[in-house]
Amino acid sequence: MGREQYNKIINNTKNTLDKSILEKITEFKYKELDGYYVIEVYIKSNVKAKEMGEIITNIEEYSKECGFNILVDFLRG
């Protein structure tokens, strides 16, 4: 997966997630680790498990539509 596909996935996430959830995300980063595509989602400390579930579902479902299997990693920051 290249930068263009990553940007497409993140833009979809920003356009489809509820604004109240997006406000709790500080940053997205992309890396490849041991052959896996990983999107790191940096979140504020007040994110609830349900909101994290919505983020991961949004990213994974759209990624699969684009033909990629993505791992989502949540980090505080």
What are the roles of these predicted feature ranges?
Residues T16:
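Ligand-binding pocket scaffold of soluble enzyme catalytic domains
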Residues E51-K64:
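An amphipathic, aromatic/His-enriched active-site/gating alpha helix that lines ligand/cofactor pockets
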Residues K19-I39:
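Short edge beta-strands and adjacent turn/loop segments
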Residues M1, I25-Y30, I70-L71:
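Short low-complexity stretches enriched in small and charged residues
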